[in-house]
From Swiss-Prot:
Protein name as it appears in the record: Crossover junction endodeoxyribonuclease RuvC
Biased composition (Basic and acidic residues): 182-192
Keyword field: Cytoplasm, DNA damage, DNA recombination, DNA repair, DNA-binding, Endonuclease, Hydrolase, Magnesium, Metal-binding, Nuclease
Annotated source species: Pseudarthrobacter chlorophenolicus (strain ATCC 700700 / DSM 12829 / CIP 107037 / JCM 12360 / KCTC 9906 / NCIMB 13794 / A6) (Arthrobacter chlorophenolicus)
Region annotation (Disordered) ranges: 161-192
Top-level lineage group: Bacteria
Catalytic reaction annotation: Endonucleolytic cleavage at a junction such as a reciprocal single-stranded crossover between two homologous DNA duplexes (Holliday junction)
Residue numbers annotated as active site: D9, E70, D143
Annotated signal peptide: none
Compositional bias segments (type: Polar residues): 163-176
Compartments where located: Cytoplasm
Subunit structure: Homodimer which binds Holliday junction (HJ) DNA. The HJ becomes 2-fold symmetrical on binding to RuvC with unstacked arms; it has a different conformation from HJ DNA in complex with RuvA. In the full resolvosome a probable DNA-RuvA(4)-RuvB(12)-RuvC(2) complex forms which resolves the HJ.
Cofactor: Mg(2+)
Length: 192
């Protein structure tokens, strides 16, 4: 069974959106990726409307089973946090109207799931997203790569109900993060 996840890296100026199909063996394939941009010159209500309209279109077009949204975290710039929170609210409401579950993931969770380290930088995340999805070129801008990383993270952490890679923890077809995750899950199963 394939799980379709729509990942959203919320932002008021740039909102990354990515759709990924993930198989039970954790093989992930990009379906679509994009960024919804709004101008700071526009009023807040119009900016949120642009994001809401785009999210509605993506939900209708790609019919994801779940949304993975980056959890808002505290930053020094309050206006940035507010914009991210407002964009997140629009996205979550769009999913709720359709009865689509929403999962929130912290940036550290996403980095750890994709790269194996919760303190990785954006370049490392983009590089591994490109490898995991077998893309010819890295998704740009970083908001697009982050949206795909969110979708991958959700599917690998909670989504598919699968027991990790059928190719086994030592497989060379897995990234270091996938191998570490597979080994941890295998160890947890043995401990039961």
């Amino acid at each position: 069974m394939t799980l379709r996840v729509l990942g959203v890296d919320p932002g008021l100026t740039r909102c990354g959106i990515g759709v990924v199909d993930v198989e039970r063996n954790r093989r992930a394939t990009m379906v679509a990726v994009g960024v919804v941009g709004t101008s700071p010159d526009e009023s807040l209500d119009q900016r949120l409307l642009v994001i809401a309209t785009a999210i509605d279109e993506w939900l209708d077009r790609y019919e994801p089973q779940v949304l993975a949204v980056e959890r808002v975290f505290s930053q020094l710039n309050v206006s940035t946090v507010m914009g991210v929170a407002q964009a997140s609210g629009v996205v979550i409401a769009a999913a709720a109207r359709r009865g689509i579950p929403v999962a929130l993931h912290t940036p550290s969770e996403v980095k750890a799931a994709v790269t194996g380290s919760g303190s990785s930088n954006k370049d490392a995340v983009t590089k591994l997203v490109t490898k995991i999805l077998r893309l010819d070129a890295p998704p740009r801008p970083a908001d697009a790569a982050d949206a795909l990383a969110l979708a991958i993270t959700h599917a690998w952490r909670a989504g598919s109900g699968a027991s990790v890679a059928t190719t086994g923890p030592g497989s060379s077809s897995l990234t270091p993060a996938q191998r570490a995750w597979a080994e941890a899950e295998a160890k947890a199963r043995r401990a039961r």
